[in-house]
Amino acid sequence: MTAPWVALALLWGSLCAGSGRGEAETRECIYYNANWELERTNQSGLERCEGEQDKRLHCYASWRNSSGTIELVKKGCWLDDFNCYDRQECVATEENPQVYFCCCEGNFCNERFTHLPEAGGPEVTYEPPPTAPTLLTVLAYSLLPIGGLSLIVLLAFWMYRHRKPPYGHVDIHEDPGPPPPSPLVGLKPLQLLEIKARGRFGCVWKAQLMNDFVAVKIFPLQDKQSWQSEREIFSTPGMKHENLLQFIAAEKRGSNLEVELWLITAFHDKGSLTDYLKGNIITWNELCHVAETMSRGLSYLHEDVPWCRGEGHKPSIAHRDFKSKNVLLKSDLTAVLADFGLAVRFEPGKPPGDTHGQVGTRRYMAPEVLEGAINFQRDAFLRIDMYAMGLVLWELVSRCKAADGPVDEYMLPFEEEIGQHPSLEELQEVVVHKKMRPTIKDHWLKHPGLAQLCVTIEECWDHDAEARLSAGCVEERVSLIRRSVNGTTSDCLVSLVTSVTNVDLPPKESSI
């Protein structure tokens, strides 16, 4: 019975040690959240700091200074950060940031915060007006010692009861559910600004994280499976690629029945390829750049990489909802693949997970998907993606001004044939039975580059899945076509189509 009391004495000593050493230990911080209504949290109060063992804890504050008016953004606990070590006062030193940020060590050290630029200049100090202690604060400080003693007694009792493990002990593993907020993101000031899109599983917000804009995809709790699936795909080794959307964090926000699941990624101001083509006509070089980077992203997604940059094995992944709405554009029109909620990984020796056949967006479904006649093998799913890529390439060509002819208003694939909201039966009739595809205009074929690209498009959406090109082959072809056309004089444009199509184009099966 001596062991519990020794542990009790050690625990009590550790609780009392902080005041004796005179070090700035951080156990509690002032809490504030200007965005509390949207994030469904408390607006202000106290926050108890919790972190990993052997990690230091700090307090922080963030605010804006608009023409001398202080606008508080957030206050709270901050995890181990060497920039905060041994700082007893909360002082921001950046010259003129959009959001000021400071951190410090010591209980409630973020109550008062200051801006003091490193280069010198006037010191701007914000000190909240003195307020009388609330009843809640008085109760908290009164009950804290009693709660601490109760905890020690309970711990001693628990150690006594568990000094020997009982026979027949069985570990029970429960679904842990969504993770807590990512420590480094959950505590940084993140403000939702405006809704940019609404989709099948929720909405996408433009948000501000410190001085950067990010995208926040918010799922309701009933769509937890989609959020979890996309988070797992993003967490796969090797998913950092210039043509795949950059993942930042996955978080659980709110509590009880108001829980929301957040997926935080890089933000791209130009939006989706669909939105861009609706408002813009593109040049030949822009078409080639989007097509090449888009096919490069899909090729990398499809690729099985045994050892990817020291991260481990990157399996082959099928997107299963490839469409122009899920292709985002960077400022230089580099394509970035997004929305991996329906994606499937193909790992050696493991089942691929949920491979239900008819998923994705109806308009972009391959003939075999519309028929329900899918071979549930890796290559079959990759070829389904390639059919959809053919349709997206057609969308690009339809808005390109390179050909000598009119550029029509933007239309989705098959919109001209069966309208904006086709039924499954209408698509089966048009795509499967009549084997129709979106119209390739005659004047497109008079431009040598577009003519070759149309050949590539037709080989992507071939009715025979095994005859379709791979994404890697499309990337090679677009690169070759661009170099050929841009390096050719007008005198030999006529002969270029035949010579390149018959001789120089890479073979169909380059990676599938």
Curated annotation (Swiss-Prot):
Q: Which locations, inside or outside the cell, does it occupy?
A: Cell membrane
Q: Which GO terms describe its cellular component?
A: activin receptor complex; cytoplasm; plasma membrane; protein-containing complex; receptor complex
Domain (Protein kinase) ranges: 190-480
Keyword hit for Metal-binding: yes
Q: Which InterPro entries match?
A: Activin_recp, Kinase-like_dom_sf, Prot_kinase_dom, Ser/Thr_kinase_AS, Snake_toxin-like_sf, TGFB_receptor
Q: Which cofactors must be present for this protein to function?
A: Mg(2+); Mn(2+)
What's the Enzyme Commission number for this chain? 2.7.11.30
Instruction: Name the active site residues.
Output: 321
| Main enzyme class | transferase
* Biological processes per GO annotation: activin receptor signaling pathway; anterior/posterior pattern specification; artery development; blood vessel remodeling; BMP signaling pathway; cell surface receptor protein serine/threonine kinase signaling pathway; cellular response to growth factor stimulus; determination of left/right symmetry
Per its UniProt record, what Pfam families does this chain match?
Activin_recp (PF01064), Pkinase (PF00069)
Which segments does the topology annotation call Cytoplasmic? 159-512
Q: Spell out which residues lie on the membrane's Extracellular side.
A: 19-137
PTM annotation, UniProt: Phosphorylated. Constitutive phosphorylation is in part catalyzed by its own kinase activity.
Question: Per the UniProt record, which residue ranges are transmembrane?
Answer: 138-158
Q: Which residues are glycosylated?
A: 42, 65
Q: What is its main location?
A: membrane
Q: Where is the signal peptide?
A: 1-18
Which catalysed reactions does the entry list for this protein?
L-threonyl-[receptor-protein] + ATP = O-phospho-L-threonyl-[receptor-protein] + ADP + H(+); L-seryl-[receptor-protein] + ATP = O-phospho-L-seryl-[receptor-protein] + ADP + H(+)
The family this protein is said to belong to: Belongs to the protein kinase superfamily. TKL Ser/Thr protein kinase family. TGFB receptor subfamily.
Q: Related disease?
A: Heterotaxy, visceral, 4, autosomal: A form of visceral heterotaxy, a complex disorder due to disruption of the normal left-right asymmetry of the thoracoabdominal organs. Visceral heterotaxy or situs ambiguus results in randomization of the placement of visceral organs, including the heart, lungs, liver, spleen, and stomach. The organs are oriented randomly with respect to the left-right axis and with respect to one another. It can be associated with a variety of congenital defects including cardiac malformations.
Described purpose of this protein according to its UniProt entry? Transmembrane serine/threonine kinase activin type-2 receptor forming an activin receptor complex with activin type-1 serine/threonine kinase receptors (ACVR1, ACVR1B or ACVR1c). Transduces the activin signal from the cell surface to the cytoplasm and is thus regulating many physiological and pathological processes including neuronal differentiation and neuronal survival, hair follicle development and cycling, FSH production by the pituitary gland, wound healing, extracellular matrix production, immunosuppression and carcinogenesis.
- The protein's assembly and partners: Forms an activin receptor complex with activin type II receptors such as ACVR1B. Interacts with VPS39. Interacts with DYNLT1. Interacts with BMP3. Interacts with BMP2. Interacts with BMP6.
Name used for this protein in its record? Activin receptor type-2B
Natural source organism:
Homo sapiens (Human)
Q: Which gene encodes it?
A: ACVR2B
